[in-house]
């Protein structure tokens, strides 16, 4: 029994934002930015055992211009940070970022001058995925949570304001390396 049989007269009510969110969530094309051991777990997620294609993500994009999800897997060095930002800027709107692993989320065990202490100091992050490295099941769960977040995103001018506020808030936070004396 389908939805058409339940509603009288074939009427289906929704908003444009909900329909667009549903379509966007079902067709994510991730750009992989695998830098360390988390990339191995990300590759196994695309394998037949976990089958990431169930979520419309069977195509990993090699170019940022065709991707709308950046999965940052692993630590980001200070020299790699401008490259990461450039790749993020080349992605078309709408775009989302998933920080995979504790190194991408907070620098991990690499608390030194050469490693960015959280990729959120370079690009705005939508989903943080903890673990060292996180299991493929955790990545699939994070993708499901990202789908829920995408379906709630506004469109048009409201989306532009939400993106601008999120990016300014993420970049205004002091980096962990500046707080180094306070953490010990």
From Swiss-Prot:
Name of the protein: NADH-quinone oxidoreductase subunit B
Species name: Mycobacterium sp. (strain JLS)
Nucleus is among the record's keywords: no
Gene Ontology molecular function: any one: 4 iron, 4 sulfur cluster binding
Positions contributing to [4Fe-4S] cluster binding: 37-38, 103, 132
EC number: 7.1.1.-
Subunit structure of this chain's protein: NDH-1 is composed of 14 different subunits. Subunits NuoB, C, D, E, F, and G constitute the peripheral sector of the complex.
Family: Belongs to the complex I 20 kDa subunit family.
Membrane topology value: Peripheral membrane protein
Role summary: NDH-1 shuttles electrons from NADH, via FMN and iron-sulfur (Fe-S) centers, to quinones in the respiratory chain. The immediate electron acceptor for the enzyme in this species is believed to be a menaquinone. Couples the redox reaction to proton translocation (for every two electrons transferred, four hydrogen ions are translocated across the cytoplasmic membrane), and thus conserves the redox energy in a proton gradient.
PANTHER family, per database record: NADH DEHYDROGENASE, NADH DEHYDROGENASE [UBIQUINONE] IRON-SULFUR PROTEIN 7, MITOCHONDRIAL
Catalytic activity from the UniProt record: a quinone + NADH + 5 H(+)(in) = a quinol + NAD(+) + 4 H(+)(out)
């Amino acid at each position: 029994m389908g939805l058409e049989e339940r509603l009288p007269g074939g009427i289906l009510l929704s908003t444009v934002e909900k329909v667009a969110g549903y379509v966007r969530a079902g067709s994510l094309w991730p750009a992989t930015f695998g830098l360390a051991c988390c990339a191995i777990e990300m590759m196994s997620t695309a394998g037949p055992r976990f089958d990431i294609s169930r979520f419309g993500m069977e195509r990993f994009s090699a170019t940022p211009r065709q991707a709308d999800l950046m999965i940052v897997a692993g630590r980001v060095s200070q020299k790699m940070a401008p490259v990461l930002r450039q790749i993020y800027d080349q992605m078309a709107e709408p775009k989302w970022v998933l920080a995979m692993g504790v190194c991408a989320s907070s620098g991990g065990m690499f608390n030194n001058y050469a490693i960015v202490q959280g990729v959120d100091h370079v690009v705005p992050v939508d989903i943080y995925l903890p673990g060292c490295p996180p299991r493929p099941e955790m990545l699939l769960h994070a993708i499901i949570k990202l789908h829920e977040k995408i379906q709630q995103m506004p469109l048009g001018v409201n989306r532009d304001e939400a993106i601008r506020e999120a990016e300014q808030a993420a970049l205004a936070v002091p980096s962990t390396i500046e707080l180094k004396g306070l953490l010990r």
